[in-house]
């Protein structure tokens, strides 16, 4: 999963997270598991255990990659905010850190991309937004933002922010 996000293939990663066939996290729920299994299904490994850490990948992939929250310095002094929603239209998360919760809501509309983020006290964050096609404008709390394109990636760097609440809009 990490490799898919590193390769900027968030769409396939989203497909892996949300698929419902017998080789999926959804199937683990369907077969009655209350925690992650060792294999996708008993038919692939009849002697599997029903408490296996590898299957818990979505528990760290969703906050770190889909929502894009990762520490850049020890103790989350500086965080990176780099959501990769792919075709997902909306997501909301509260990510606990040692310095307090990062709260995020992302809307991925046809005409605008909206990132609402709250950074706790004693933390700052570098913000990345998806690179849209064609002409675009970026605002933060209604004011224009000068952004730079990230070399070799489909992202814009919107700058470093301190603690507080922000609404970034790309349209």
Place the predicted regions along the sequence by residue:
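Amphipathic alpha-helical repeat scaffolds
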Residues: 1-2
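Non-catalytic C-terminal accessory modules of carbohydrate-active enzymes
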Residues: 6, 11-171
């Amino acid at each position: 999963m990490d490799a898919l996000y590193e390769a900027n293939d968030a769409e396939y990663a989203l497909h892996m997270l949300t698929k419902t066939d017998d080789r999926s996290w959804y199937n683990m729920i369907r077969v009655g598991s209350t925690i992650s299994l060792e294999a996708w299904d008993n038919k692939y490994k009849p002697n599997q255990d029903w408490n296996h850490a590898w299957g818990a990948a979505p528990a760290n992939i969703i906050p770190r990659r889909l929502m894009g929250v990762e520490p850049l310095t020890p103790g989350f002094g500086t965080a990176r905010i780099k959501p990769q929603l792919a075709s997902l239209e909306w997501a909301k998360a509260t990510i606990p850190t040692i310095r307090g919760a990062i709260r995020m809501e992302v809307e991925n509309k046809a005409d605008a991309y909206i990132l609402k983020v709250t950074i706790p006290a004693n933390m700052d964050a570098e913000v990345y937004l998806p690179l849209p096609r064609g002409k675009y404008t970026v605002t933060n709390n209604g004011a224009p933002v000068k952004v730079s394109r990230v070399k070799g990636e489909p992202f814009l760097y919107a700058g470093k922010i301190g603690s507080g609440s922000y609404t970034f809009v790309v349209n």
